[in-house]
Design a protein with these regions (language model features):
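N-terminal single-pass transmembrane signal-anchor helix
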Residues: 2-30
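Short, surface-exposed beta-strand/loop micro-motifs that present aromatic residues
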Residues: 90-105
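A generic fold-level signal
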Residues: 4, 41, 105-108
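Residue-level detector of conserved, well-ordered beta-strand and adjacent loop positions
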Residues: 65, 99, 114
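Short, glycine/small-hydrophobic-rich surface segments
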Residues: 53-85, 129
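Membrane-proximal N-terminal amphipathic helix
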Residues: 34-62
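N-terminal "domain-start" segment
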Residues: 22, 26-36, 51-55, 69
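Short, surface-exposed interaction loops/tails
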Residues: 103-129
Length: 129
């Protein structure tokens, strides 16, 4: 009898299972890294808005605006007012929120900036004053 060369069915199944497991692990890690990157983008945007409000807007107005848009925050890139999905702060479904309080007309005394994160609890920055 001649011995046939090739792989047995069991060897093929084991190889397929190992490759499938490696693929699943790769996809899970990729998704975790992507979510972490988006969370970092959200934190960066909230910090940029926060420092713009504290260092530029507050000294100029003597308070904080009742609503946020690119007109009030001229010292920063207006794209930072949009979350990673492209939804602007204040719009329905945005990951970012601006909640002013103690308002007198268009000027407010306090605010809370908030970003909903995928991998952590919400990221918040509150007014200094």
């Amino acid at each position: 009898m001649r011995k046939q060369s090739g792989f047995t069915v069991i060897e093929l199944i084991i190889t397929i299972l190992v490759l499938a497991s490696a693929g699943v692990i790769f996809l899970v890690q990729k998704n975790n890294l992507s979510a972490g990157h988006r969370d970092t983008q959200r934190k960066t945007a909230i910090n940029a808005i926060y420092y713009n409000l504290e260092e530029i807007v507050y000294p100029k107005l003597g308070g904080y605006p009742a609503t946020l848009d690119a007109k009030q925050l001229k010292a920063m890139d207006s794209e930072l007012l949009k979350d990673p999905n492209g939804t602007a702060i204040g719009e329905s479904g945005s990951d970012y929120s601006y909640e002013p309080s103690s308002c007198n007309g268009d000027i407010c005394e306090h605010y809370v900036l908030r970003a909903s994160l995928e991998r952590e609890a919400a990221f918040e920055r509150k007014s200094r004053n």
